[in-house]
Regions:
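Short beta-strand->loop
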Residues: 41-43, 134-136, 153-180, 194-198, ...
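C-terminal motif of bacterial Sec signal peptides marking the signal peptidase cleavage site
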Residues: 23-27
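Bacterial N-terminal signal peptides that target proteins for export
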Residues: 2-16
Length: 349
């Protein structure tokens, strides 16, 4: 198996490569401007959504306060993004893939305790789930998780050590095998077989999409539902999305980085920025970009887009993120055991 570093070259991104590089370089710097500026440090697949959301919020904020605001974005693997904030990235808000990633920042004192209750729905304004993206016609006839281990399939999925989406991918697969057996040895064997068939392991979800789409590697991409929808929009005749019978409710989280926002004088606008995610306009926009709105009535408006019948485990089924991370993703936990036992070490040519 080959682990790859995150690539900034992405055909399906709305931003040009130059703009992405500019954001990556300036997103965590100082803020000296007459216009209020806040930095949103986010994870890989949200870039298109926030590119659309930011102008919507800027217009709302100008109409409400008479003041202009500029939003700087920074994107990458969720775990790596959290570490960048801990190491000094001047984020005003974080919109990350996992509650656990924000908890890591909280533990440094940068985010106040109780952030999970600061916004509605446990500070999760939109959700997603984990699906399969396959090439048009589904040549390998992949329908469910069993197909990934029973057939000669090359899988693309990112690395849970750096990607929040990859952690959700792992838990989605585990949720499926838990439905089949209570035997922990059988569950682990299933996961080990699945990960032995991962041919490229990128550092982030968008990097894995690039590997699958741009580089034409692998037979199936295990992906966020919203990432699959975005890819099919960009390549309407080339890919199909397969929703497995069992998956997990992936709940990205948002928070104000209180110490930074206080120092930058942006606490008020940062709060407005995250609160606005829960408005009807923003919820519908999230749905347009493939995220499941937390507002149930708006979610039902998009029932033709989202499979609302799939069985979804939640992180609570795993004891919450602290427990799940300790059991599966910490050094020496189950993922490391599986990865360490992968003796194939296959690489794509």
């Amino acid at each position: 198996m080959k682990r790859k570093s995150f690539s900034m070259v992405k055909k399906i991104a709305v931003l040009s490569m130059a703009a992405i590089l500019l954001i990556g370089c300036t997103g965590c710097g100082s803020k000296k401007s007459h216009v209020r500026t806040i930095t949103n440090v986010s994870y890989d697949p949200t870039r298109e959504f926030y590119e659309a959301y930011n102008p919507l919020f800027e217009k709302y904020y100008k109409e409400k306060t008479g003041k202009e605001v500029n939003i700087i974005q920074s994107h990458g693997g969720s775990g790596a993004q959290a570490r960048s904030v801990v190491e000094g990235c001047n984020a005003d808000v974080v919109t990350l893939a996992l509650e656990h990633d924000i908890t890591l920042i909280e533990q440094t004192g940068l985010i106040d305790k109780g952030w999970e209750q600061e916004f509605a729905d446990d500070s999760s304004p939109y959700t997603s789930t984990i699906v399969f993206l396959v090439r048009k016609g589904n040549p390998k006839q992949i329908r469910d998780w069993d197909d990934l281990v029973n057939k000669k399939i090359e899988i693309i999925t990112p690395d849970p050590k750096s990607s929040g989406g990859a952690c959700w991918n792992f838990l989605a697969a585990l949720s499926y095998i838990k439905e089949q057996t209570d035997d922990e040895k059988e569950q682990k064997a299933f996961l080990q077989k699945l990960y032995s068939q991962v041919s490229v392991m990128d550092s982030g979800a968008r990097g894995s999409t690039t590997t699958f789409v741009e580089n034409q590697k692998g037979d199936v991409l295990i992906a966020w539902e919203n990432e699959a929808i975005t890819t099919m929009k960009s390549y309407p005749d080339e890919y199909e999305m397969i929703t497995p019978s069992v998956s997990i409710l992936a709940q990205p989280s948002v928070a104000i980085v209180d110490d930074n926002a206080d120092a930058n004088g942006t606490q008020e606008v940062s709060r407005e920025y995250l609160n606005y995610l829960y408005t009807d306009d923003a919820q519908r926009l999230a749905a347009e970009y493939g995220y499941r709105p937390s507002n149930e009535s708006i979610l039902k408006e998009f029932s033709d887009r989202f499979d609302l019948n799939v069985k979804l485990y939640t992180i609570k089924d795993y004891g919450g993120w602290n427990e799940a991370y300790k059991n599966y993703f910490d050094d020496g936990a189950m993922f490391d055991e599986i990865y360490g036992n992968d003796v194939s070490s296959r690489e794509l040519a």
